[in-house]
């Protein structure tokens, strides 16, 4: 493959919204932010190149109380118990708390088709159209994980 224009077109078109699950201060290393989404939702293209991150203003945090001078480097991790689940090793971010939302930008290429329902069901997909946001793929449920599985009759309980 010499040229892959699709990735250049699609990457900026999709963003991943993640919730901060935990914030830890690691002595000698700095802040570690753990999100509810990570490598299980991001495509391999996103795994090789760090994506820009930013906090989403949900209105419950006074953004004026967090000037850029309060930002500090943070390592950002996904929810997987794997050393590869690093979203960013050092991104300047404001003070964060569990429940805050982070936006992983430029996450479009192959993200939906190659995400894996590991640890939790897959995320929904929202299209931001001319009339506002529209759900175009609902979030998976626990039942969705098993809906295609078939149980042979000899394994069924009487």
Q: What kind of region is each of these model predictions?
A:
Residues 1-158:
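Charged (often Lys/Glu-rich) extended helix/loop segments that serve as interaction or gating elements
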